Amino acid sequence: KALPELAGKLTGSSIRVPTPDVSIAILNLTLANDTTKDQVNTYLREMSLHSGIRKQVDYIDSPEVVSTDFVGSRRTGIVDGLATIADGVHLVLYIWYDNEFGYSCQVVRVMEEMAAVHPPTYPAAEPETAAAPGV
């Protein structure tokens, strides 16, 4: 109801897993065009590394992770690439999240955006300097 333009295109559920802080959301999407698991995962991996939402979305494709690995994550969600299912226009994504600390971090990000306040992150990047000749 909050996003009427997504009516009939998105359903989802969230499962509380047996840890104090971590849950998983399962998104069932209907896309406009056919896609493959590799295309989706490549796109989501790149978004998690190089886009403006990289502080919000992370990507993992390791069979070694367990739910407690995500406790304390600042990300809004961590896409589980191994669980991605793509079948034509139908896509299922599994997204882990810390439903306490991660949620709190997202509230802070939303408030910063609403107030147009973006505090610096530390450590600040050092300006590049030219190396001395012969070094």
Summary of predicted features, one role per range:
Residues 1-91:
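C-terminal substrate-binding/catalytic lobe of Rossmann-fold NAD(P)-dependent oxidoreductases
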Residues 71-135:
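NAD(P)-dependent Rossmann-like dehydrogenase/reductase catalytic/cofactor-binding core
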